[in-house]
Amino acid sequence: MAKGILGRKIGMTQIFDENGVLIPVTVIDVEGNVVLQQKTVEVDGYQATQVGFESKREKLSNKPELGHVKKANTAPKRFVKEIRFDALNNELLALEVGTEIKADLFTAGEDVDVTGTSKGKGFQGNIKRHNQSRGPMTHGSRYHRGVGSLGAIKGNMKGKNLPGQMGNEQVTVQNLKIVAVDTENDLLLVSGSVPGPRKGYVVVRSAIKKGN
């Protein structure tokens, strides 16, 4: 059954498995997930589960937001997302509004996809942004780190490699394995790295493509 949960990236560490093999893992805090709404085909045109994570003060919320979370009998949330899968496979659809989702939703050994916002790098040139090669750095060369030839004078195609904003975009890493689940502290330990900085919000979903 497909499922999902919201969380905050704490950072990376490493653990040893039963064979003594060192595994780098990312620690994700999933404490405080609450089902805020169940979307239905009859009312909304599709099926999904709206989940909220990490409470915030009521002073920081507007009246529509307060009315929405009141139906779930919970505090306003900082991070709200919809977990959407095929209706027959979505395990979250069986949960009632206001139900708290814990780390034990997942078990060690499951494959997951983790979505987050990558670190923003600001305005960057082609060498860093698109991994292009630089020109000669010797005396007399007029081309060092420039863009180079862009083709015709007029009518450049959209998507051409040019300098611009780098990072700060949604990134999904697929087929990561849950190495361990800490039910006491509501933590997930996921193999490898996940997108975004420390304390960044992430969405952990069941893997769409199963790993080999």
From Swiss-Prot:
Cysteine pairs bridged by disulfides in the record: none
Biological processes per GO annotation: translation
One cellular-component annotation, GO: cytosolic large ribosomal subunit
Region (Disordered): 117-142
A GO molecular-function descriptor: structural constituent of ribosome
Keywords, alphabetical: Ribonucleoprotein, Ribosomal protein, RNA-binding, rRNA-binding
A Pfam family this chain is assigned to: Ribosomal_L3
Source species, domain of life: Bacteria
Record-stated family: Belongs to the universal ribosomal protein uL3 family.
Quaternary structure annotation from Swiss-Prot or TrEMBL: Part of the 50S ribosomal subunit. Forms a cluster with proteins L14 and L19.
Protein purpose: One of the primary rRNA binding proteins, it binds directly near the 3'-end of the 23S rRNA, where it nucleates assembly of the 50S subunit.
Protein name, per record: Large ribosomal subunit protein uL3
Source organism: Acholeplasma laidlawii (strain PG-8A)
Gene: rplC
